[in-house]
Every structure is written in C-alpha cells, then in structure tokens.
Amino acid sequence: MHLLAFDTSTDALSVAVMRSTPTGPLYWQHQGAGGAAASGSLIAAIMDLLRQADLRFQDLDAICFGSGPGSFTGLRTACSVAQGLAYGAGVPVLPVSSLMALAQTARAAHAPEVTQGCVIALLDARMHEVYAATYAFAGDVWTTLQAPCLLAPEQVAAWAQSAGAALGADKTLPGYKDGQPGPAKETGLVSGEERAPLLLKVQIRQTQQGPAPWHAWAGNVFGIYSERLAAPADLICCNALPQAMAILQVAPALIAAGACVPPEQALPLYVRDKVAKTTGERALEKAAKAGIAHIEAASAAAHIAQAAAHAQTSGT
C-alpha cells in the first residue's frame, strides 16, 4: 500500500509518505511551519517526499489528511490540497481526525508495547478553550469514546471522568477504577470512529491478562492551561502534536473499514462554529473596558484628592 499523509491543523506542518516493499513499508517524512505558512510549503514538501519515495500521485492508494479540529486556515489548506491532488490523480481521500492522530502519536512515543489503554487528546483551541476527544485502544483497534468537542480548560477533568460512565457500571475503561482516573505518572489505529462502547468492553476483557492498561492525557495544552486543567497529580501527561506518521499508522485499518471518501466528500472537521467576535460584540467589549477604565480613573482621582486633603490637614 502506498500512502501520502499530511496534517496542518496546528502550528506545525507534518508530511509523510509510505511505500510498500516486499520486505516491509518504507517511510519518508517532513516537518515544517504550519498554520498559514503551510499554504506556501505543503505542496513543495509533498512533491519532494514523493520524489524521494519514487512514487507518482497515481501510484497512491489514498491521500490522507488531518481533518481537524484545529486551525481554520490550516484545515482549509489541508482539505483543499487533498481534494485537488485526489481529483487530479483519481485516488480516494481519507480524512483522519487530528485528535485521533494525536492519540496515536502519544501512544507510539510513550507506550508502543502496551496492548490496551485510553488517551484523552487535547489541542489548544485559543480563546481560552481546548479541543478534546477520548480514544481507547485494545490491540490495534481504536474506538472513539467521546467525539471531538470544545471545552473550557476547567471542564476537562469532569468531562474526562464521564468517559468511564460511557462503558457502563463495570467501569472497564483503561486507567479508571470506580469511575475515577487510576494511578499514573508523568512522562516527558482505528477501525471505525463510532464503534459502540460495548464492543470496546469485550475487547478489553479479552486482553485483561496482558500488561496493565495505559491511561494518558496528550496534547499541547499543559504549559498553557496547566493550573486550569486540574489534572490528577499522578496522571501521565504527554506533550504531543498530530503527526503525519501517526496518520499513516492508523490509515490501513481505516481504509480496510471503508473510511475513504471521494474528493468532494472530504471536508474539514469544524468543532467551533465561531472564530471571531462580531462587530457588536467588539463594540460592547470596548465599551465595557472604557467603562472600567473610567471607574478606575475616577477612583484614582478620588484617592489623590483624599490624600491631598489629608496632607493639607496634617500641614495645618
């Protein structure tokens, strides 16, 4: 299987190519600046990796991209490039949630040998909010427990605990005991995004004799919202971003499950509908700030007058 994957949902651009060979797959990857900068460098990076892999667009089995959530500019760039290349080459497109790619990135980096676990993927959404999703894995099968959503940092801990309840009264979610996060410590694929939690419970029970379940939070939010997240002190927190290599790792199972779509159906995953304040909202905010500034100025003036009167009284 020959695959191209890229993710531009964050400030980091990630591109990777997989070429199958008789002795196993070979990989090429590129890292660069993402966001708005990705629009000027993504295609050049893709062309360079395909040249190194000696592949043409027509040789690809699918073009995979991180569909979001994330930077609106980055998502539009990735989606438009994926659609354009797929139309021209006549190959299908595989949209992969950037949060799912983040979960796989964290697992591959911190727990490659673990057979079961759960990752809560968190990306900074700016505006004092985070994108969040919960994914569990048993063997090579990932399951979406909580679909991507938008939360305030203070909401994440309670929202994460609710994933345990989604599995039923027996609380078989990896890393949870009696519905609460289990002991952990800090460290420096998916065959259908909407599988029923019951299926995951069966898979986990089948592997209970293996290594202890691994439970972690992963993302780029810990340095930004560390105090507001209120994560358990002993929780594993992995600093990570979605990577194209992780998309390649989840892609074969997704393709086998029929997740590829024609180019016109490959769309970004927008979790937030609003990215800017309206003119009216900005005016109200400006007026409120002006009102606060006026009150503060009046208060300061009153203090000065009071101090002056006191000084005059003391002098007499």
Where are these regions (language model features)?
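N-terminal beta-alpha supersecondary unit
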Residues: 1-67
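Conserved hydrophobic/aromatic positions in well-ordered beta-strands
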Residues: 4, 16-18, 131-135, 269
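Surface "functional belts" at beta-alpha junctions
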Residues: 21, 37, 92-242, 275, ...
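Residues at secondary-structure transition points
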Residues: 33-41, 72, 76, 80, ...
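Phosphate-handling active-site elements
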Residues: 52-58, 86-96, 114
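DPxDG-like acidic metal-binding loop motif
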Residues: 64-98
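Acyltransferase
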Residues: 223-224, 237-316
